[in-house]
Structures are given as structure tokens and as C-alpha cells.
Amino acid sequence: MQTVLAKIVADKAIWVEARKQQQPLASFQNEIQPSTRHFYDALQGARTAFILECKKASPSKGVIRDDFDPARIASIYQHYASAISVLTDEKYFQGSFDFLPVVSQSAPQPILCKDFIIDPYQIYLARYYQADACLLMLSVLDDEQYRQLSAVAHSLKMGVLTEISNDEERERAIALGAKVVGINNRDLRDLSIDLNRTRQLAPKLGHGVTVISESGINTYGQVRELSHFANGFLIGSALMAHDDLNAAVRRVLLGENKVCGLTRAQDAKAACDAGAIYGGLIFVPSSPRAVSVEQAREVISGAPLQYVGVFKNADIADVCQKAAVLSLSAVQLHGSEDQAYVNALREALPRNVQIWKALSVSNALPARDYHHVDKYIFDNGQGGSGQRFDWSLLQGQPLDDVLLAGGLAADNCVQAAQVGCAGLDFNSGVESQPGIKDARLLASVFQTLRAY
């Protein structure tokens, strides 16, 4: 044990002694009640589990979330999480034990106390502050310390997340009978990330162990791929860095998905409830899903999606006017708009409105060489036609800035997701008729995307 980790643990020992003076165990031990929220049970089930983390700062990133409101964070996480992790280390993560009861009161899930635990006192303190589980790191503890600390946790009906980061610690975790093992993809000695650690260590943990992959997970593609090795994921920094936390969680759990061609407020709500991030409003008069500004306002009133206006060879002033009055998050160009058009549009649009460009894919991939284009939509050229192009063209391509469109529905969305684009763009495949979305089809698509 050395460098960053050694320094943190040395400082933690000093903190523990000071806290014992300030808040002696005898002053609160009689008030401690056993946990009634079962951490081990919460991570069981057919679907991949998610431990979502409340984290203000870290040694590798500094302050991650300025506007850190644990109650608000927990109120969002409760819709997605199997358990919620709370950083309580003060010096390096700007955490606090005071965050634990706030989160516990704001969400029904088991609460994990994430700290560098080296003393039974910390576990009693965590339970007093309403934690239902604690992290024990084999990089910090010897076997005797681990046995003592896990026994204290279990005596309080708390769960233990046992963290490992190499083969030696994996062997120890097995010998110690750890039920839930977290594989930390971050090397706590130099803070580097290697997702291969999960791939290498998980298969050797054996049956009956719940495997959680920790650190460095920030995309839906990573989650889908690593879900073959892990039963769940602990995710913090990738979520905390985003202002729109709800969208950030959806982006990782489901992908960056859009439902296009919305014409009714109830359909916007159904899309949002199902798990979409973006809602598409089509301002192309020839489309059967075209809407006016008034209709668009009505759609937007239905749900807090990020709305994208779809245009085709439109007058730039018209695009900007609609973007302004409807507070659009992005404008999507579906015509023959060239670089000069995009340049002029970028100059005229507010900076916070993105520009997306739809590209038709037939026999070969088009170049993504526009300046000032934030995302591309790959379609078969006839938006809303329900036809797909040959997805094998996308193999081996970097697709972080691409949404895949064309003929997407419940029967092919998983295959589409595995292509590796940032997200999927649904339209006719979730409709009962053009412009009328089917809430059951929407729910089915997103449940299918989450079934891993």
C-alpha cells in the first residue's frame, strides 16, 4: 500500500481518533437499531443491479458537482437504483456522515456508506446515521481486520461490499466468504482506469458471488458489454458531472435515446416515462408528423424531455425563431444543408442549442466531417419510413456522436444497441399510426433495452 491510498488511510486513522473524541461510541451505541433494508437482497434478481453514488468530489477529479444536494440526488436515483452509495470521507471526497440520513429519508433503497473503513467505530457510526451497508477494501485491510469489521456489520444486519482490485485480493475475498465483491477498475495507487480488470477478475470469483464493477463506467455500451461479466455496477462520477442528472442516469442505463415525430403531449409523457432523453418535433411540412409551433408547445407541456426540432432546408431565421420560442435543446437538419449553411446557423443560434445532422446511409458510410455539428443521425434516407440500412457497415467505427435511426422497434432494438451508437432514434416502430405513439410499444422498447 503506497502513494494516494496510503496517504488517505493514514489521514483516516487520524480522523477516526478525532471523531471518537468528539462523538464517543458510548454516546450513541444504545440508540443504534439493526438495518431493515437488505443490501444483499437488493442486488439479487434477473436484471443487472445499479448502485448509484452521491459524490461531490474525488482526488482524481476535484469537485465534480458544485450544486450537491443529497436529497434531490436521491429523489432521482430512487427511480433507477438497486442501492444508493454515499461518500462520507470528508478530506478527499468532501463527503459527510450527515448525508446518510438525508439520502435514507429521500429514497427507499439500501444506503451504502462508502468510506475507507479501518475501525469498527466507523461501522457503528455509519449505522447510527442510517447506512444499511458499508464498503470494506481488501487493499486497506488484512484478513483479521476484515473478519472483525464484517462481523460488526453483519451483527447490525448491514451488508458488506468487499472491494478487490487484483488476483491476490480476489483469492482473499473468496477465502473470506465475501457475498458481494466490487471489482475496482481504478488503481488506487496511481488513479488510472482499466476496465479489463472486471473482465479478468470476475470469471474467477465463482458462483454465488454477486459481482459489482466499480469506476470508469460511463456509457451504455460499456454497461451492456461488461454485464456479461458483472451482476451490477457502481456508478458515481459519470453521473455527478451532469447538470441534468435524470438524463445522465438514462444515458448510462438505457442509452441516449430519442423518440421522434411527437405530435401529442400524452406521447411525450409516454416517451419520458419509458426512458427517452430526447423528443423530436418535426417542422417539415411534407411529413405526416409535422407540427406547428402551437402544437409543439402542447407536446412540450407533456413532459420534460430535451426537445429536438427537425428541419429540412429551412430558412435559418425560421430555425432560430422556433429554437428560441420553444427552448429547443438541438436542431436536426434533414435536407441538403451544406457547411456554409451550418456555419451561418451556428453563428445565429444560441451556444447551448446543438446542431445535429441526419446522413443517409446506403452502401457506404458517409463522412462525418462537418464543423459545428454535435451529433449525426444515421438513417436510410427516408425518415419515418420504418426501413433500416445495413448496420454491419458500422462495425469497428467510433460512434459516440451517432444516433441510429430507421425501422427501430422492440424486435430489433437490442441488436441496434449492440452496434455501439450513442443512442437510438425511434419513430414509426413505436406508433399505432403516423404521428400517434403507442405507450405500450414505447414501454416495451425501453424495457427491452434495460433487460440485461
Swiss-Prot record:
Pathway: Amino-acid biosynthesis; L-tryptophan biosynthesis; L-tryptophan from chorismate: step 3/5; Amino-acid biosynthesis; L-tryptophan biosynthesis; L-tryptophan from chorismate: step 4/5. Pfam families: IGPS, PRAI. GO terms for biological process: L-tryptophan biosynthetic process. Keywords: Amino-acid biosynthesis, Aromatic amino acid biosynthesis, Decarboxylase, Isomerase, Lyase, Multifunctional enzyme, Tryptophan biosynthesis. Its EC number is 4.1.1.48, 5.3.1.24. GO terms for molecular function: indole-3-glycerol-phosphate synthase activity; phosphoribosylanthranilate isomerase activity. It comes from the Bacteria. InterPro entries: Aldolase_TIM, Indole-3-glycerol_P_synth, Indole-3-glycerol_P_synth_dom, Indole-3-GlycerolPSynthase_CS, PRAI_dom, RibuloseP-bd_barrel. It catalyses: N-(5-phospho-beta-D-ribosyl)anthranilate = 1-(2-carboxyphenylamino)-1-deoxy-D-ribulose 5-phosphate; 1-(2-carboxyphenylamino)-1-deoxy-D-ribulose 5-phosphate + H(+) = (1S,2R)-1-C-(indol-3-yl)glycerol 3-phosphate + CO2 + H2O. Residues 1-256 are annotated as: Indole-3-glycerol phosphate synthase. Residues 257-452 are annotated as: N-(5'-phosphoribosyl)anthranilate isomerase. In the N-terminal section; belongs to the TrpC family. Bifunctional enzyme that catalyzes two sequential steps of tryptophan biosynthetic pathway. The first reaction is catalyzed by the isomerase, coded by the TrpF domain; the second reaction is catalyzed by the synthase, coded by the TrpC domain. Monomer. This is Tryptophan biosynthesis protein TrpCF. It comes from Salmonella typhi. The lineage of its organism: Bacteria, Pseudomonadati, Pseudomonadota, Gammaproteobacteria, Enterobacterales.
